[in-house]
Amino acid sequence: MENKGLTNTNDAAYQKLIDNITTLWGEAKSKAITAINTELLDANWQTGKYIVEYEQGGKQRAEYGKRLLVNLAKDLTARNGKGFNRTNLTYMRKLYLAFPKCGTLSHKLTWSHYYELLKCDNTLEMQFYYKESIKECWKVRELKRQMKSCLFQRLALSTDKAGVLALANEGHQVQTPQDIIRDPFVLEFAGLPKQKRYKESDLEKALKDHMEQFLLEMGRGFAFVGRQYSMQIGSRQFKVDLVFYHCILKCYVLIDLKRAEIKHGDIGQMNLYLNYFKTEVCQPDDNPPIGIVLGARKDELLMEYALEGITNQLFVARYQLYLPKREELQAQLDKLLDETKDSI
């Protein structure tokens, strides 16, 4: 006779045995993951500490500068494998600078949480999302969503702070005037009254108005060409937000404004526009066009890689002399953040 089993699966004691073992292994896995996260976070912090201490070790090391992380990435990867690319090392360094004392790191958050938090340009903003992530037990995806929706800035500007937090905790995407659409970068940049509510299209129009006026008033050779400049590329229609011609540099300047974080695709799209201008718009005696992608947040490494293609060093020097520096443009967007300390 075939033995189909030694136990009765309907037996309560047997079901309890299954439940106990399942619970045991679930807790064990959870503890293991927590332990791994703790060790990973501490190791990343310590790595950042080593890098900063090395940088501060003397003048010669300081002059080693930007090549340090590039060389470290190559050598550490060769010896230890993946996980030590330049971007990761940059964020490990940022982690130490943001949290100089290891004891202030909360192990309730993962390295992926800190990776997103360290993208904040403003310490106050980072601390806000840091505390909210712990308090509300946000997963990484939820943290990214809240940051993208500019929860910190909307909360700082709103008189109904509890209402804004309630909307955020409900997972509600702010998309209409009734949802308190208030982007602090746009409001400050465009000089709009804070008490009024605007549609997203109104805010973007005001932002472009202000950017256009800002560049023209700088008196550095900018001539306005057009807004929402249309380009037919293949079978598709594209539009770039603002186009200027720089009379001193003898080149077109294309500007794309992004309300959220600048993505790799935004840089690629700008490169597409630049190639179009080189082929279809520029005259033989024009210099290559310049593209500026401006957003609420930026990844310095991404921006650096995106500008790698400029090889004419003389042209780059004139670019730095006559065009507004990246910091000048970003300052126009970030200005309000300095005024929010007393608002929260």
Where are these regions (language model features)?
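Basic, low-complexity intrinsically disordered segments
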Residues: 1-344
